[in-house]
Amino acid sequence: MEGKTVIFSVLVMGLVISQIQVEAQKTCCPSQSTRKEFEDCISEGNLQILCSAESGCRDTYVGYCPSGFPYGSLTNSGDVVNVYCKLGCVSSLCGALTSLQKLDTSGKVNVAVERCTKACSTICTKGSKTAVETV
């Protein structure tokens, strides 16, 4: 019984540590156009590491962007809430569908990805205007 408790404790600690590392990750880009390219790639449901490589952006865990990569986030506006909500929603909920997209020849997965992306857009824009107005 003690062995199971130790294994369970190590598993929980590993999950907590990996969650902290994921939350601390920041993507920094050399220009606004590469930042936009990165965001478009993510909104299509691709993995963050793939989008960083394709757009020329860098993932960092230090909390700030290195020199030459000053664009770590969008400018502060009401649209930022929507953009980041959509990016997070699409990448977490629609990512698995996107990887299936390449294997599907019938087009059914394309429809599912479109619906998933639209659902994320609806969820994210529904209450964001109220939240931005109250801040």
UniProtKB/Swiss-Prot annotation:
Membrane spanning residue stretches: none
Family annotation (Gene3D superfamilies): Thionin-like
One of the GO BP terms on file: defense response
Annotated S-S bridges: C28-C65, C29-C57, C41-C51
SUPFAM superfamilies the UniProt entry points to: Crambin-like
Annotated keywords: Disulfide bond, Plant defense, Secreted, Signal, Toxin
Location within or outside the cell: Secreted
Chain positions listed as propeptide in the UniProt record: 72-135
GO cellular component: extracellular region
The organism's place on the tree of life at top rank: Eukaryota
Predominant location category: secreted
GO molecular function: toxin activity
Signal peptide: 1-24
Family according to the record: Belongs to the plant thionin (TC 1.C.44) family.
Job of this protein: Thionins are small plant proteins which are toxic to animal cells. They seem to exert their toxic effect at the level of the cell membrane. Their precise function is not known.
Protein name per UniProt: Probable thionin-2.3
Lineage: Eukaryota, Viridiplantae, Streptophyta, Embryophyta, Tracheophyta
